[in-house]
Amino acid sequence: MTGVHEGTVLVTGGAGYIGSHTCVVLLEKGYDVVIVDNLCNSRVEAVHRIEKLTGKKVIFHQVDLLDEPALDKVFANQNISAVIHFAGLKAVGESVQVPLSYYKNNISGTINLIECMKKYNVRDFVFSSSATVYGDPTRPGGTIPIPESCPREGTSPYGRTKLFIENIIEDETKVNKSLNAALLRYFNPGGAHPSGELGEDPLGIPNNLLPYIAQVAVGRLDHLNVFGDDYPTSDGTPIRDYIHVCDLAEAHVAALDYLRQHFVSCRPWNLGSGTGSTVFQVLNAFSKAVGRDLPYKVTPRRAGDVVNLTANPTRANEELKWKTSRSIYEICVDTWRWQQKYPYGFDLTHTKTYK
């Protein structure tokens, strides 16, 4: 035990985008970390970068949460005192095409994880949920900006997996009084570690706006596809609440600290800035960060997308003593720094840098 905190935090999906940044914050705050990741949409190089940035050793297990014996072995061999759960498939568009894969991986994997926690008496559980559990908040009964009390209704298989998992956790905490769970419904992550050593590294063509724009800027993609410009917004493009990944990582650790001090049973928190940006506003901010206009084409709407997802983060601001501190422009600047430094992300078979 090297940290000032007692026990070890298991981070599932810790080699992924948000997970890796959260591991850095955990280690900087004195926690010890064990990462479990099947590397289906991440690379082990991220683990090496975590160690490089923090100067601390991370225990890494390449384990799929569907592999119950392998997961049980991790719990048996480590003194795990809390779990932060990021692992899962995460693309809205892809989930519409392969729904069974999303239901099997995301839901069954989480059930296996909770069963291991129960077996090994691990209490505190931070679940990486999503604003997609709100479905379309502009429907009747919805509210913008979105409070935690907004009716939930997933509009894509991905969003429904997050909603079902929330329901599973809520049901389990009603009968399992030793489970203490935070449901973190975050909005649209972006940005990268200010060192430029960690960032979003999607395998294949990016599904999210910021890494897509970044690959256009660095020359890996020809142009940005804007999925629809006929939404009822100021410029016709959808509105999202973008949150810097470092702000998001700090929120996960704030939630964990809160659980260690308070028994909440099961409580949701929105993680966002409270300010929405359209696709074109983000594109303009990124163009400013790069220093030139970036090409785009308008294409038909994407299945499962909704017009506006903007958070009301008041509960997290007040209870977790957390709020965002980085702007959409800073998100773009940090993303661009990462993409310039590592045009091919963690794929070290490419040595090209962008000048």
From Swiss-Prot:
* Pfam families from the UniProt entry: GDP_Man_Dehyd
Q: What is its EC number?
A: 5.1.3.2
Molecular-function annotations in GO:
UDP-glucose 4-epimerase activity
Q: Which GO terms describe its biological process?
A: galactose metabolic process; monosaccharide metabolic process; UDP-galactose biosynthetic process
Q: What happens when the gene is disrupted?
A: Leads to sensitivity to thiabendazole and microtubule-depolymerizing drugs.
Pathway field of the UniProt record reads:
Carbohydrate metabolism; galactose metabolism
InterPro entries registered for this protein in UniProt:
NAD(P)-bd_dom, NAD(P)-bd_dom_sf, UDP_G4E
Tell me its cofactors: NAD(+)
Q: Name one GO cellular component term.
A: cytosol
Q: Does the keyword Isomerase apply?
A: yes
- Record-listed NAD(+) binding positions: 8-39
Q: Which UniProt keywords apply?
A: Carbohydrate metabolism, Galactose metabolism, Isomerase, NAD
Enzyme class label: isomerase
Matches recorded under NCBIfam families:
galE, PRK10675.1
Q: In which family does this protein belong, per the annotation?
A: Belongs to the NAD(P)-dependent epimerase/dehydratase family.
Q: Which PANTHER family match?
A: UDP-GLUCOSE 4-EPIMERASE, UDP-GLUCOSE 4-EPIMERASE UGE1
Q: What is the annotated role of this protein in its UniProt record?
A: Major UDP-glucose/-galactose 4-epimerase under glucose-rich conditions involved in protein galactosylation.
Name-wise, this protein is UDP-glucose 4-epimerase uge1
Q: Organism source for this protein?
A: Schizosaccharomyces pombe (strain 972 / ATCC 24843) (Fission yeast)
Encoding gene, per UniProt annotation? uge1
